[in-house]
């Protein structure tokens, strides 16, 4: 491709990347262009070129796609958060479905995966593996129960908060993200006013100076409880009682804490927590299970869709109350406790010690006694418990990080031979890879369904059910009725002639 930086060109967007950038092609050369939509014809400016692909900036939409809409957020193009705001929600769901389906077919080699348009049709019309319609939201806004806002200063030294521009640490000022709860705006303005009043400076990455680095806000959607955690570059927040007094007057405020992070790092939260108001956690529900959520807890950010996601996982697990279930990468026990009410025993495995403590506490507050949690890596705990202690599994549920399951973990699952494996995935490429591994070793995909947990972004969750292809215990023979009676007559004749 004979093009250099700042050259302009025209291209039609044919596809989108996992991070929501439009993909256009010129004579086999691939361009990635942010803020474009499938079907757009655009003018773009070259930013960077590689041997077979390059990056360009959108200059002008020459012919808009039928799927293009006006973004609601005023900083949509500058912010690194919502990559798909310029695409209609219906088309977003279609894009995510296609992405997962194509990965499963191309990477997972599931050529026989049938797409089903209506729920319920799969049982009678599609005897093999089925790909069910994506579970979307009626209103894909204000769905996030968690937000982390960086604090910094603009070129004039004024305190700003908002979100980072894509692939940078430049803060785009925005105190009201339309994906977050409305209380975020009031909380951020109160903290910003407090900092200005008492001359408390925001953190500066370059000089490792200043105090306030980030503010974490969480809300229990079912309980209405609010949590605020200030991440500080120090051990003391001057005049903190003034801030607490203001924050606690916000309706629902339940917990206020400080996270001490004095390291030169991009990691947001520190290891030391100082609780300055409330119990140090909030509570929320998924279904009828109550969860305690601390500042460090992993908890799904979209509660409405989480209930759909876990409900689907529970359905695919097919529990009758007699099964032994292993829940790998279990976090604070969200799926484990959801399953435990319908299983004989659930074992959860998690590498983060705080999450395991939270999981055990969540089991206690719900009175769930048939669950046990192990601290450690899934690829170490599962082989140990199976090979040394002989613990079996009827169902295995996995919900790994984006990198997918470790091969040793998958190998142990195959050796254990559970009837069903329920795979919850946040990355369809690694899902497809791991599904291929299991299918090559005695399992078959039965159902796949996407859940739009992260509306207006390029990410999607997927639930996949695999069943064990065990040999039938009996031989099934289909015999025509006339053949049946002919055989019976011959048997009678043979018996009479003996």
Region annotations inferred by a language model:
Residues 22-27, 162-165, 229-231, 359:
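Short, acidic/hydrophobic/Gly-rich beta-strand patch recurrent on exposed beta strands
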Residues 170-213, 234-260:
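Internal alpha/beta scaffold segment
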Residues 132-140, 205-206, 214, 218, ...:
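Short, solvent-exposed loop/turn elements at beta->coil junctions and helix N-caps
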Residues 217, 224-233, 290-294, 395:
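Short, aliphatic-rich beta-strand segments
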């Amino acid at each position: 491709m004979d093009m250099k930086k700042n050259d302009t060109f025209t291209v039609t967007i044919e596809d989108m990347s996992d991070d929501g950038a439009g993909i256009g092609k010129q004579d086999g050369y691939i361009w990635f262009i942010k803020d474009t939509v499938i079907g757009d014809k655009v003018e773009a400016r070259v930013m960077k070129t590689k041997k077979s692909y390059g990056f360009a900036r959108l200059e002008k939409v020459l012919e808009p796609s039928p799927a293009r809409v006006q973004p609601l957020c005023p900083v949509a193009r500058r912010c690194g958060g919502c990559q798909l705001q310029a695409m209609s929600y219906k088309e977003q769901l279609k894009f995510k479905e296609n992405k997962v389906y194509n990965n499963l077919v191309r990477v997972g080699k599931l050529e026989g995966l049938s797409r089903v348009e209506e729920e319920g049709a799969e049982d009678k019309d599609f005897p093999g593996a089925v790909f069910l319609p994506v579970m979307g939201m009626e209103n894909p806004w204000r769905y996030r129960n968690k937000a982390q806002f960086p604090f910094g200063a603009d070129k004039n030294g004024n305190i700003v908060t908002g979100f980072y521009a894509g692939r940078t640490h430049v803060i785009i000022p925005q105190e009201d993200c339309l994906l977050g709860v409305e209380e975020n705006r009031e909380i951020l303005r109160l903290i910003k006013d407090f900092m200005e009043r008492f001359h408390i400076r925001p953190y500066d990455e370059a000089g490792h100076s200043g105090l306030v680095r980030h503010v974490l806000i969480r809300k229990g959607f079912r309980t209405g409880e609010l949590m605020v955690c200030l991440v500080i570059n120090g051990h003391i927040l001057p005049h903190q009682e003034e801030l607490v007094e203001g924050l606690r007057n916000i309706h629902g405020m339940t917990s206020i804490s400080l996270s001490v992070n004095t390291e030169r790092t991009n990691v947001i939260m520190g290891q030391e927590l100082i609780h300055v108001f409330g119990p140090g956690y909030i509570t929320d529900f998924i279904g009828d299970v109550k969860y305690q959520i601390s500042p460090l807890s992993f908890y799904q950010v979209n509660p409405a869709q989480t209930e759909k996601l876990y409900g689907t996982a529970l359905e695919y697990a097919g529990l009758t109350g007699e099964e032994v279930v292993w829940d790998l990468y279990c976090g604070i026990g969200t799926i484990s406790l959801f399953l435990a009410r319908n299983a004989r025993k659930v074992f959860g495995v998690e590498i983060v010690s705080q999450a395991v403590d939270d999981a055990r506490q969540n089991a206690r507050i719900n009175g769930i006694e048939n669950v046990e949690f192990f601290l450690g890596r899934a690829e170490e705990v599962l082989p140990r418990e199976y090979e040394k202690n002989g613990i079996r599994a009827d169902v295995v549920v996995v919900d790994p990080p984006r990198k997918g399951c470790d091969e040793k973990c998958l190998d142990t699952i195959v050796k254990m031979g559970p009837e069903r494996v329920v795979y919850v995935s946040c990355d369809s490429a690694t899902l497809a890879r791991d599904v291929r591994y299991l299918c090559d070793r005695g399992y078959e995909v039965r159902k796949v369904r996407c859940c739009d947990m992260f509306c207006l972004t390029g990410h999607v969750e997927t639930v996949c059910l695999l069943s064990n292809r065990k040999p039938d215990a009996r031989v099934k023979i289909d015999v025509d009725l006339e053949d049946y009676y002919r055989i019976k007559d011959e048997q009678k004749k043979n018996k009479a002639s003996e």
